[in-house]
Amino acid sequence: MDAASAAGIDRAPFELFLIEEAALLDQRRFRDWMALFTEDGTYWVPAEPDQESPFNQASLFYDDRDLMKTRIDRLEHPRIHIQTPPSRTAHLIGNTIVETADEAAGEFLIGSTVIMVEYRDEQQRLFAGRQRHRLRRDGDSFRIVQKRVDLINCDGAFEAMAVPI
């Protein structure tokens, strides 16, 4: 099903899924967040606008399940200096659209806007951009095949980013 056909699909279940995903991140429930991904799922934050591939240049994040687990292990370690004190975040998800849908295969491409505010060590940082979730139906919910976050300032200078957006 193409984008024109996807326009008639109810976006409410997808919005709810994205809001629940953001809540897991805000609650620092990183292992529950990782469980939303398929076994071959990836999380990608490109370092350049319109970057086509995570393989031909650097990315801010490009994690498969193994790298997600390693990153989460580090985030949960009691002596991780980059997270002392731990970050507190608030995500806002909006402008959700069903871009493409293949209902027979149970696969959907969902676009949305994301804003994340991170507060740590008396400093506040703001991240904003468009995100695209490639979702696969899993019973009454979905699993993430790929999450791509295109930050509006992806090619800017960043201090270390530890928590997922």
Could you describe each region identified by the protein language model?
Residues M1-E39:
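Short, low-complexity N-terminal intrinsically disordered segments enriched in polar/charged residues
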Residues L25, A35, G41-T42, A58-L60, ...:
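General N-terminal targeting signals
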Residues E39-I110:
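A solvent-exposed, acidic/Ser-Thr-rich amphipathic alpha-helical stretch
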Residues A90, I97-I165:
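A beta-strand edge to alpha-helix "cap/lid" segment located at domain peripheries
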Residues A12-L16, S59, D66, L126:
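A generic "alpha-helical surface" signal
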Residues E20, R65-R79, I115-R132:
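Hydrophobic transmembrane alpha-helix bundles
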Residues A6-I9, N56, Q123:
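Conserved aromatic-histidine-acidic binding/catalytic patches
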